[in-house]
Amino acid sequence: MLSGSAQLKLLQLVSPTLPVGAYNYSEGLEWLIERGNITNADTLGAWITQELCRGSITVDTAIMVRAHRLAGQMPKTDILPSPTLKHLSYWNQWLTATRESRELREQSLQMGGSLRKLLLDLEPTVQSWFEPIPPTEPCNYAIAFGLGAAFWGIDLHQSGLGYLHSWANNLISAGLRLIPLGQTAGQKLLLHLTPTILHQWQQILLLGDDDLYSCSWGLALASMGHESQYTRLFRS
């Protein structure tokens, strides 16, 4: 069970008000809604469920798990040993390379950079944990989240559920503004996704390094289409 302090820090880390810019991104939803592929709460829910089960969020969360595990065993006052430095750098570069569109890559790196800067402002001693990713190298959001959660003593299970829930919450928020839908419809959808989030989290924990893949061609096409969309409210 999380301590009271860790619980509060988890709530802070997954809060929609965390200044990392998540509200600026729809991950292709804006393009899909303009094309008429998503028109109501049911089609929005179907899209988010599909992404939860087969999309790139599965890979993102799996990389967050690896960052958390690598950092979670280290005392806060110690510099990470060279194997850990190497692995963190590898997974950060690997995740950047797997992005299927410019907007999705920029989203992950912008949010990751903002979270890294925020964590350094809040907890200067976390600097050593980010040592494998120098300030000149962009940091993916999944890496920064995993390191921050581990540093704050948030256990892996709660970190993973929080990561997935905040992702779903952000997409629902974007959908509410774009379709548009009422707030109650959004809350019903978020509640409906609870079993899927719980199930997918357990599946993610079972993924080995060779199992990391996603079938997200729909997301890739939507994101690429959004890059040339004439009128846009969101950055992805």
Swiss-Prot record:
Belongs to the UreF family. Keywords: Chaperone, Cytoplasm, Nickel insertion. Its main location: cytoplasm. The gene is ureF. UreD, UreF and UreG form a complex that acts as a GTP-hydrolysis-dependent molecular chaperone, activating the urease apoprotein by helping to assemble the nickel containing metallocenter of UreC. The UreE protein probably delivers the nickel. GO terms for cellular component: cytoplasm. It comes from the Bacteria. This is Urease accessory protein UreF. InterPro entries: UreF, UreF_sf. Pfam families: UreF (PF01730). Gene3D superfamilies: Urease accessory protein UreF (1.10.4190.10).
